[in-house]
Amino acid sequence: MTIYNFSAGPAVLPKPVLEKAQTEFLDYNHSGMSVMELSHRSKDFDDIIKDAEKLLRDLMAIPDNYRVMFLQGGASLQFSMLPLNLAQGRKAYYVVAGSWGKKAYAEAVKLSKTIPFEPILLASSEETTYDHIPEIDSAKIDKDAAYVHITTNNTIEGTSIYDLPETHGVPIVADMSSNILAVRYNVADFGLIYAGAQKNIGPAGVTIVIVREDLLNDEPVLSSMLDYRIQAEAGSLYNTPPTYGIYIAKLVFEWLKELGGVDEMEKINREKSGLLYDFIEQSDFYTSPVKSPKDRSVANIPFVTPSQDLDAKFVKEADALGFKNIKGHRSVGGMRASLYNAFPRQGVLDLIDFMKKFEAENK
């Protein structure tokens, strides 16, 4: 039985990457050691992390005036690290179009009770259960603000921001955890990008931060571990980094480059997601909670049947047939097909075949 992993993260990894990691697991580069055993100060690991950064720069066309960091703590730590480094004494705007954007804003509000800055809710679609991307009134943005924070892909609700808001020069900061390397964004349009690795980059434990150099604070009053400048100047080696996760990320970057890069990956992702969206649209049994096609994610596709009982039956039968982790997030319900970069097109076709069969038997 073929297993298809629809998990929203940690998620499916490319089979060639896993196979290469397997062959190198006990003896990396004739060192007699596993990558997990390499000193982070060794030449072997120095080559790994430098190659990983170069590959990521090439894939995303990252300009030279941006620094790339491989950090720890997940994207959730960035909810605090970001305002601590960039926003002290200033305003910071937040667009809340999903659960993770809400958490980022809530963390900023919490921090503002002890750190002098003003988090402001610029736009939200919470009233309609995040079923769309809210309209953003750029006239409300103070030109002296520290940043405007967005989440480019809402993993739970299945919406995405593809067209960036006009911010009149105020840096856009993006949580890009679930669609980094899946669709093309112009890095120069952002002041800072951060992303947890466990969707499109590798195993959980690595967080990518890409920041424009002029935004690095000269004298932030905060812990060295939370200081972007210290981490950047140390080459992500201020303390022991997640070495094996960075190694897997490098292999994923190599795989993506060989595939044709981000532009080719976006074509593949739009085709995969389009197959499923088209089927849902043509069905009167399944429904997408995201009404506007322009807001729909290519990475995370939620859908429901006519009842919660049928949803539960669908998940149970799908799981038995090898469609794993397709249950929707507990806050939304229904089902969610996470079609990250490594998810195969055949898995989408097989899912649609099952959906047709389930509909015929339960309509």
Curated annotation (Swiss-Prot):
The modification N6-(pyridoxal phosphate)lysine is found at K199. PROSITE patterns: AA_TRANSFER_CLASS_5. Its cofactor is pyridoxal 5'-phosphate. GO terms for cellular component: cytoplasm. Pfam families: Aminotran_5 (PF00266). Signal peptide: none annotated. One of its GO terms (biological process) is pyridoxine biosynthetic process. L-glutamate binds at R41. InterPro entries: Aminotrans_V_dom (IPR000192), Aminotrans_V_PyrdxlP_BS (IPR020578), Pser_aminoTfrase (IPR022278), PyrdxlP-dep_Trfase (IPR015424), PyrdxlP-dep_Trfase_major (IPR015421), PyrdxlP-dep_Trfase_small (IPR015422). Keywords: Amino-acid biosynthesis, Aminotransferase, Cytoplasm, Pyridoxal phosphate, Pyridoxine biosynthesis, Serine biosynthesis, Transferase. One of its GO terms (molecular function) is O-phospho-L-serine:2-oxoglutarate aminotransferase activity. It is found in: Cytoplasm. Its main location: cytoplasm. Homodimer. Belongs to the class-V pyridoxal-phosphate-dependent aminotransferase family. SerC subfamily. PANTHER family: PHOSPHOSERINE AMINOTRANSFERASE (PTHR43247:SF1). This is Phosphoserine aminotransferase. It comes from Streptococcus mutans serotype c (strain ATCC 700610 / UA159). The lineage of its organism: Bacteria, Bacillati, Bacillota, Bacilli, Lactobacillales.
